[in-house]
């Protein structure tokens, strides 16, 4: 009986050790893959379009504000010209949320 118990403890110990090594190998592979993806993303990054500048060439290129990304908003200006104009703008509800978070940060921090 003691032999079976000793053999069981040894088997559980070996199994836990081997599974821990496999998990370490998987974690290392995931970290390497994540780092390579981040490097590719940084190399692929392009200049963003500042607020109130023309974004008609790329509607997803607007810069980020402190918390939220600006949105490319298109409209037709008054004056009879039928040409669409697109600029990067911050929606009002997001502007108010940023102001509120700034006030809260100033109050507590």
From Swiss-Prot:
Classification via InterPro entries: Spider_toxin_CSTX_knottin, Spider_toxin_CSTX_Knottin_CS
Q: Does Signal appear among the keywords?
A: yes
Any one Gene Ontology cellular component term annotated for this protein: extracellular region
Q: Where is the secretion signal located?
A: 1-20
Which parts of this protein are propeptide?
Answer: 21-44
Give the main localization category.
secreted
MF terms (GO), sorted A to Z: toxin activity
* Keywords associated with the record: Disulfide bond, Knottin, Secreted, Signal, Toxin
Which Cys-Cys disulphide bridges does the record give?
48-63, 55-72, 62-88, 74-86
Q: Describe the family membership recorded for this protein in Swiss-Prot or TrEMBL.
A: Belongs to the neurotoxin 19 (CSTX) family. 01 subfamily.
The protein's name is U3-lycotoxin-Ls1x
The organism encoding this protein is: Lycosa singoriensis (Wolf spider)
List the lineage, top down.
Eukaryota, Metazoa, Ecdysozoa, Arthropoda, Chelicerata
